[in-house]
Each structure stands twice: as C-alpha cells, then as structure tokens.
Amino acid sequence: YINYKNMSHQHLLTLFNLLPVGSNISTWWNFGSMLLACLMIQIITGFFLAIHYTANINLAFSSIIHLSRDVPYGWIMQNTHAISASLFFICIYIHIARGFYYGSYLNKEVWLSGTTLLIILMATAFFGYVLPWGQMSFWAATVITNLLTAIPYLGTTLTTWLWGGFAINDPTLTRFFALHFILPFIIISMSSIHILLLHNEGSNNPLGTNSDID
C-alpha cells in the first residue's frame, strides 16, 4: 500500500522506488535502464576527455598521458570512461540474453531496432579503441578496416575512402574521432525509437504469472 498524500514530502529517489511496477517484471528488466545510465556516463566523461584529446597521430598518445598525469581528475574521467564501456557491453549482452530467453525476438520491430543499436555500439567502441593510437590501436585499425577489402569490386575503394588515403594515417584518426563523437548521439536517437516501438503494442506478461496478482 502506497500513501500518496505524503509522497510530495519524500525524497525524489524514494518517489522513484515507490513507482508501482507489476510483479511479473523481474530484475532482468533493469538492464535497459542500466544501459541508459552507462550511455549518459559515457557521454559526460567522453565530453571532458574530448576537451583534452588531440586527433593527431603524433600527439594523440601524448595527449592521453597528459590527461592522466597533469589534468586534475583526468585519470578518473579516463578510467570511468573505460570501465563504463566494459559495463556497457556486459549490460547489453545480459539485456540480449533476457530477450532470447523470454522470446522478445518475436516483437520484430523492437528486436531489429535493438540489433541496429548493437551494431552502432560496436562501431562506436571500435572507433574509440583506435583513438589512443598506441600499438594495439594501430593494429586494430589496420586489421578491422582491411576486412572491407573482402567486398567484391568496391572493397579497395571503400577501404581507401575510409582511410582517407592509401594507408592508415592522420586523416584516418581524425575521421575516427569525429565518428566516435557523433555516434553516441545517434545511439540516443535510436534508443528513443527502440523504446517507442517497445511501448507501441502495450505490455505483455513475459513471466506468465497471474496478471491479477497485484
């Protein structure tokens, strides 16, 4: 029983905790909200990292070392961004596993929009991995982008276009930084569509419990 008369005098977080939710929704339904929280953390920390980052092959690694050592609380921003990225993928894989288990793929529009979100997220993570321009960043950029050459007829042209030349160089890093910056905002837009499609048909009873239990 919720006493709505006293709700206005309570703390905001307490109000959220008191929001009525059906008993047929379990802990597995938390991960969509956690993904949104991860996205917000990534955008906020990423903004502060972008302020100090230099998209140049000669300065990129040094700018990150400067961020870690010289910028006040820069190391917190960098580590939070990295750890939250890992948490992002843990949450999304659990979110997808929940969808497989409860047959959410039958809702085709929601499932396909979610699949698109996963692909965009993986691309964003790849572009971010390249940005420090360390040895592994260079290797990743070379190997992954070279996969485009497997496309018949257009492969070599597409790879050259993506690199901004005939080899991975400064233009590659610049456009990867631009893509890494813009894609999270596309993810926000796609997430909104994902949620709209989810609520388009109304709710269901995935756990199969008594709908009158509450």
Curated annotation (Swiss-Prot):
GO terms for biological process: mitochondrial electron transport, ubiquinol to cytochrome c. It comes from the Eukaryota. It is found in: Mitochondrion inner membrane. The chain crosses the membrane at residues 31-51, 75-96, 111-131, 176-196. Heme b b562 binds at H81, H180. Belongs to the cytochrome b family. This is Cytochrome b. It comes from Bothrops atrox (Barba amarilla).
